[in-house]
Amino acid sequence: MSSYKYYDLIRRPVITEKTTLLSEQNKYTFYVDKLAEKLAVKKAIEEIFKVKVKKVNILNVKGKKKRFKGVIGRQVDRKKAVVTLEKDHNIDFAGGIK
């Protein structure tokens, strides 16, 4: 698989208070493509960030119902991947921020 497909597979990192606490345990969370599988996510993370992945957990997140100007709508469904890295590896999302 080419590196372009890896970048299409991993949408963006999920940066919240909960995921920040998980990163201390070497667990990082990403939104991934709806058709992504564990093995493909593992290969993509290893190729993009040059780290060693220990385990991948996949979650399907259902979209919430929302109201906008009196019209009831729904957010899109998403897929999240929680990636556990090996002990000596980490990902620095805020590397250039000072």
Swiss-Prot record:
**Does the keyword rRNA-binding belong to this entry?**
yes
Q: Which spans are transmembrane here?
A: none
Q: Name one GO cellular component term.
A: ribonucleoprotein complex
Fetch the InterPro entries from UniProt: Nucleotide-bd_a/b_plait_sf, Ribosomal_uL23-like, Ribosomal_uL23/eL15/eS24_sf
Name the Gene Ontology biological process terms: translation
Q: Name one Pfam family in it.
A: Ribosomal_L23
On the tree of life, the source organism's domain of life is Bacteria
Answer whether the UniProt record assigns the keyword Transferase to this protein.
Answer: no
The GO molecular function terms of this record are: rRNA binding; structural constituent of ribosome
- Provide this UniProt record's keywords sorted from A to Z: Ribonucleoprotein, Ribosomal protein, RNA-binding, rRNA-binding
- Describe the subunit structure: Part of the 50S ribosomal subunit. Contacts protein L29, and trigger factor when it is bound to the ribosome.
- What is this protein's function? One of the early assembly proteins it binds 23S rRNA. One of the proteins that surrounds the polypeptide exit tunnel on the outside of the ribosome. Forms the main docking site for trigger factor binding to the ribosome.
PANTHER family xrefs: 60S RIBOSOMAL PROTEIN L23A
**What family, per the record?**
Belongs to the universal ribosomal protein uL23 family.
Query: Which protein, by its recorded name, is this?
Result: Large ribosomal subunit protein uL23
Which organism's genome codes for this protein? Rickettsia bellii (strain OSU 85-389)
Gene this protein is translated from: rplW
